[in-house]
Regions:
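RNA-binding accessory domains that recognize and position tRNA/RNA substrates
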Residues: 1-152, 156-179
Length: 179
């Protein structure tokens, strides 16, 4: 099980609108992204940025409390220009998604009235999720080496989470991340 910080930065969710079913999200905030382990890998994030295109939740906690708090979820998403929506029956939405499979969707943010028909047109003409090339966005561009042990595990980065690298390191191997 992971928290929302790990989920939002998980490369496997790149390009998706992520729906969380827990009724209250944001109550422990976001930890300091500068906190890393001895290999320089973030301790609390699965990649170096938010990977999702939008977040759908039932209720956002605007008050966060945690010993490692650096900002609220709302502040983090605002700073990273990732839209979110609350007030949604996420459990009903999840059941619809479970029955229907992947569906195209849009979160539209505007200071003026939203033209729903225009949004529908844009969504209909958007690149379908199945056709997008996410590998270019989530893969490392250059080889990265973690540790200096003789025994080595090579990780072909097709969207590898930081946790995979951390786990390889924890069992005593050098990790080499390659594109």
């Amino acid at each position: 099980m992971v928290g929302y910080t790990e989920a939002l930065t998980d490369p496997s969710y790149n390009g998706q609108l992520l729906t969380l079913t827990y009724p209250l999200v944001g109550n422990y905030g976001i930890p300091d992204p500068k906190i890393t382990d001895e290999d320089g890998i973030s301790k609390y994030f699965e990649s170096d940025k938010i990977q999702i295109r939008g977040l759908v939740i039932h209720e956002l906690s605007l008050t966060a409390s945690h010993w490692n708090l650096s900002m609220t979820l709302d502040e983090w998403m605002y700073n990273e220009k990732v839209p979110g929506i609350s007030g949604i029956d996420t459990r009903a939405l999840t059941m619809k998604l479970r029955n229907s499979g992947v569906m195209m969707g849009a979160l539209v943010v505007s200071d003026s009235e939203i033209d729903v028909e225009e949004v529908k047109k844009q969504l209909a003409s958007a690149t379908h999720y199945d056709s997008e090339q996410f590998m270019d966005e989530v893969s490392t561009k250059e080889e990265k080496i973690y540790g200096s042990e003789e025994q080595t595990v090579v990780i072909v980065d097709t969207g590898a989470k930081n946790a995979i690298i951390r786990n390889v390191r924890e069992i005593g191997y050098r990790a080499i991340l390659v594109p």
